[in-house]
Swiss-Prot record:
The keyword Nucleotide-binding does not apply. One of its GO terms (biological process) is dGTP catabolic process. It comes from the Bacteria. This is Deoxyguanosinetriphosphate triphosphohydrolase-like protein. It comes from Azorhizobium caulinodans (strain ATCC 43989 / DSM 5975 / JCM 20966 / LMG 6465 / NBRC 14845 / NCIMB 13405 / ORS 571). Belongs to the dGTPase family. Type 2 subfamily. Residues 68-215 form the HD domain. PANTHER family: DEOXYGUANOSINETRIPHOSPHATE TRIPHOSPHOHYDROLASE-LIKE PROTEIN, DEOXYNUCLEOSIDE TRIPHOSPHATE TRIPHOSPHOHYDROLASE. GO terms for molecular function: dGTPase activity. NCBIfam families: dGTP_triPase, PRK01286.1-1, PRK01286.1-3.
Amino acid sequence: MAVSGARPRMTWACDPVWTRGRLVPEQEGTRSAFRRDCDRIIHSTAFRRLKHKTQVFVFHEGDHYRTRLTHTLEVAQIARSIARALGLDEDLAEALALAHDLGHPPFAHAGERALDACMADYGGFDHNAQSLRVVTRLERRYAGFDGLNLTWETLEGIAKHNGPLTDRSGKPLGAAGDVLPHAIVAHSAVQDLELWTHAGPEAQVAAISDDIAYDVHDLDDGLRAGLFHLDELEALPLVGAVLAEVRASWPSLETGRVIHEVMRRLITRFVEDVVRETETRARAAKVRSSFDVRMAGAPLVAFSAGMRTAEAAVKGFLFPHMYRHARVNRIMDEAQGVVRDLFALFMARPQEMPADWQLEGAPPERMARRVADYIAGMTDRYALDQHARFFDTTPELR
């Protein structure tokens, strides 16, 4: 099956004409509500900062490794392709892809782990929840409101990037543990995002596009960095088969072109599988509206069982060979130290933060959240610069 042009809008797609609106009502003008969400995200300060935030490799390790920004753009491209093939709203899928990592602190998941540990006594830190906080509170550009005043559908999708957060009674589910992330609780006090339901279809598209981009592009970056080699991928169910296809078609092809051909074919296989499986599930569930999608007992947008196994094998390979590689771990251990140092410094001496970040006389919990917001907004480079400003030694992270 080839994923080709757009099909007519499905009845179960989210429709900008029938959006649940914005917290602060606005006239939408010539652009659709979801298109305006995309544009606001692209023009935000947090989006620009993604350029100098780590994906896996710290920003200065090489010009061709992915950053949070290039990863985000790749997720958006995949999300638009899937949404177009399914007859969903491309603008909403793109908006959710563009926003999904806005809350990531510097130094990738190492920075998040360090910040979460620092915030253990103050409600913790979660980058998905922080993305919601960025677009609802921390961006301060508009005259009439804080945040970006995005539509309900976009905010819902950001909050539920990994699925429902509570059961119908409000009890936290899964990774949320016993307590919901602070940013989710804070926003729920002013707007009900129906945390107990699944997200809308476009949000599910953005989430699975994130998985596809992670899997394929981390394989690509790992190969470029020399953390592992093509021959080591032969045993992976899907990747090995695609690699064999490429080698059979072009036996003398140079390695760089082989890698690119394998990666582009992997994306195509993943996307085509998602489209087929989603169409099958939609027919079986007889969904007629985005409400039906949200009320379904399982995600509608998903991999088939076979592809889910193949995708899990890719992740299973990447963990020991890339994410826990000794070189990566050494750098990320040092990066966590930078975050811990900065948090302790600003908690003890909040006057060292810029004037508009200071909260004189604030209670510890509020001050800690302020410090976490400040650090989470830093790029890798700015975090290292700030560390060098206040500490005698700062790691080079190379």
